[in-house]
Design a protein with these regions (language model features):
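Active-site-adjacent C-terminal substructures of enzyme catalytic domains
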Residues: 29, 33, 42, 51-170
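Extended substrate/RNA-proximal surfaces in nucleic-acid metabolism proteins
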Residues: 1-42, 64
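Short acidic loop-to-helix transition motifs that present clustered carboxylates
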Residues: 24-25, 46-50
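Conserved residues at beta->alpha junctions
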Residues: 21, 46, 96-97
Length: 170
């Protein structure tokens, strides 16, 4: 961790880092980044509720791309999605393109988190705003179709929605 901070030096403003707290040393990383003034955001995570609570206790205060690249909500295991909806001490960011989150999930986020508990983002990919078709981006072919952008394996690869589109869909 110290080598990272030596390499990047001083970062102006309030930098943000996203990490999965369940990785080996993840909770120590949360503490290290918080001590250096970072906003620690939890994302791409399969963490259980106890690990997420431990990350919150160490200063993590946000969740990246809420509901995506994380273990889904289950009736026997709230996981990161249930945790994010219930914890007042953590905000979440949502991609309101209706592909990353359904209209019902967006309504659930709004109801559980309130207007101060979530941040609207677009996750716009370089092909945002372009017509349906295939585009070469980041060394791979991305396909824009029906308002979604997907990689060759069919996974979402960012969004074609711009922020004003997301505002309208919220």
């Amino acid at each position: 961790v110290d080598a990272f901070f030596e390499a990047v030096g001083e970062i102006p403003g309030r930098p943000v880092v996203t990490l999965a707290p369940e990785i080996p040393g993840g909770l120590d990383l949360v503490s290290a980044f918080v001590r250096r003034g970072f906003l620690v955001s939890l994302g791409h995570t399969e963490a259980d509720v106890a690990t997420l609570d431990a990350a919150l206790a160490r200063g993590a205060r946000h969740m990246t791309h809420f509901g995506n690249a994380m273990k889904p909500l289950h009736h026997r295991d709230a996981g990161p999605v249930g945790w994010g909806l219930l914890r007042d001490g953590a905000t979440v960011d949502v991609i309101a393109d209706l592909h990353h989150l359904s209209p019902e999930m967006l309504a659930l986020v709004r109801r559980c988190k309130g207007p101060e508990g979530f941040v609207l983002i677009s996750d716009a990919a370089p092909c945002a705003g372009l017509a349906d078709g295939d585009y070469s981006v980041w060394g791979e072919t991305l396909t824009v179709s029906a308002g979604a952008v997907r990689n060759a394996s069919g996974g979402l690869a960012g969004s074609v929605a711009l922020l004003d589109d997301c505002v309208e869909r919220l």
